[in-house]
């Protein structure tokens, strides 16, 4: 899981900081949701002793990663960072290292975490909550790295205060109503919204997108995307939101292997799933009444092709985010094979000096730079609100299909034009 787990509301008591998820059997789960003395904070010190969470292994930054980089402006964007939970996501994208960024304030509800984020971001100003940070008139843009259920509410709060917003995934959490509300708010605001979907800047998906846009693939006939992350015990999360999480509510790492290549969408879905053997994925043990740890969705695409997108929590073995695509004129699985010989450069663009590639396949620095550059150039970010929601909403409907035994369901379409 990649979204950080800062608590959602500034009114929380200190004793309600973080769910302790050592055991997720029925009694422990109810204790966790009951909060009180059973809810324990995960301190930065404790986190540093844990095994690195899948996806957060830092990819090496190539020695020539900044070769050819040219600034598009000499202006510095004033940014606020919110959220420094178990994944320490608030500082993971190197906003603090970008030559066109000044991190002017940070926030986390838990004081120790807030202080650690301030230190990591080399920032002196802290706020006790997002709701207080967004009142700072100096701030132009905010990165929301809070708990996944709070992403839509927090992004709406940022937009309401006239600031650009970047969000960790997913854009919304199981709610089609939140999706439409956020979509309309972004359109009405005229501000930049970007979801930091890491697959977009994986080397393979970046290459797929370049070749597709150059016409080297034609219409895609078939796409596959997979996000496999074995979690017999869920990663710690505020109020245990990861306990029993429906796989297709966290679909963007896999769904990006179509939407992130073509800019298209999914129009209908039939999703199959099997009951899980894991404790936290028993319906009685999670707030979602979710019985599934693996959900495999077959989508119809906006190009009238097909896409198989899978998310799995309960199958041990190889993990990560990966994908393959086949088009009318060629295919791409690690490399391009097809009929077109005149292809574009598929190397990822240069990073600003001092910015590392980071985690999730070396995507972090590229995503942050794309958001910053879109603001400076006053253009649409790559992972805009339409693409963010077309990935996320498709998963919400896919889980509904799985709960209905694979019934084929239509998917709402969200377009900026």
Locate each region found by the language model.
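Contiguous beta-strand/loop segments that form the cofactor/metal-binding neighborhood of enzyme cores
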Residues: 57-69, 73, 249-340, 365-381, ...
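Beta-strand-loop-alpha-helix segment that lines the small-molecule cofactor/substrate pocket
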Residues: 141, 147-148, 152-200, 215
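N-terminal Rossmann-like dinucleotide-binding module
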Residues: 40-121
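Glycine- and charged-residue-rich phosphate/anionic-cofactor binding loop of Rossmann-like
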Residues: 102, 374-391
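N-terminal export leaders
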Residues: 25-42
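N-terminal secretory signal peptides
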Residues: 1-24, 50-51
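C-terminal capping/lid region of NAD(P)-dependent oxidoreductase domains
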Residues: 45, 49-51, 191, 218-222, ...
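Predominantly a Rossmann-like dinucleotide-binding segment in NAD(P)-dependent oxidoreductases
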Residues: 189-289
């Amino acid at each position: 899981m990649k979204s950080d787990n800062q608590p959602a509301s500034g009114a929380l008591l200190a004793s309600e900081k973080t769910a302790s998820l050592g055991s997720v059997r029925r009694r422990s789960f109810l204790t966790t949701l009951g909060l009180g003395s059973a809810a324990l904070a995960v301190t930065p010190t404790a986190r540093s002793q844990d095994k690195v969470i899948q996806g957060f292994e830092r990819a090496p930054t190539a020695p020539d990663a900044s070769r050819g980089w040219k600034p598009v402006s000499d202006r510095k964007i004033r940014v606020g960072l919110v959220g420094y939970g178990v994944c320490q996501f608030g500082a993971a994208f190197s906003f603090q290292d970008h030559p066109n960024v000044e991190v002017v304030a940070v926030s986390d509800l838990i004081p120790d975490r807030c202080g650690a984020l301030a230190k990591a971001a080399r920032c002196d100003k802290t706020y006790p909550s997002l709701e207080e940070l967004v009142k700072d008139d100096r701030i132009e843009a905010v990165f929301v790295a809070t708990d996944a259920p709070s992403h839509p509410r927090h992004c709406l709060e940022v937009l309401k205060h006239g600031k650009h917003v970047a969000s960790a995934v997913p854009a919304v959490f199981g709610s089609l109503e939140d999706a439409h509300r956020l979509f309309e708010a972004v359109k009405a605001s005229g501000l930049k919204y970007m979801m930091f979907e890491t697959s977009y800047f994986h080397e393979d998906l970046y290459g797929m997108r370049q070749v597709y846009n150059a016409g080297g693939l034609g219409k895609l006939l078939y796409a596959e995307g997979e996000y496999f992350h074995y979690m017999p015990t869920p990663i710690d999360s505020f109020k245990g939101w990861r306990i029993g999480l429906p796989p297709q509510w966290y679909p963007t790492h896999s769904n990006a292997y179509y939407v992130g290549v073509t800019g298209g969408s999914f129009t209908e879905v039939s999703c199959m799933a099997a009951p899980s053997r894991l404790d936290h994925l028993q319906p009685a043990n999670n707030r979602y009444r979710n019985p599934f740890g693996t959900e495999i969705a077959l989508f119809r695409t906006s190009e009238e092709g097909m896409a198989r997108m899978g998310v799995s929590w309960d199958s041990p073995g190889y993990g990560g985010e990966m994908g393959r695509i086949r088009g009318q004129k060629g295919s791409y699985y690690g490399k391009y094979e097809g009929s077109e010989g005149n292809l574009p450069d598929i190397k990822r663009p240069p990073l600003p000096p001092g910015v590392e590639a980071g985690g999730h396949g070396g995507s972090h620095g590229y995503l942050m730079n794309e958001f910053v550059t879109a603001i400076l150039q006053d253009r649409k970010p790559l992972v805009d609100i339409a693409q963010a929601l077309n990935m996320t909403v498709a998963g919400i409907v896919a889980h509904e299909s799985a709960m209905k035994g694979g019934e084929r369901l239509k998917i709402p379409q969200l377009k900026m034009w």
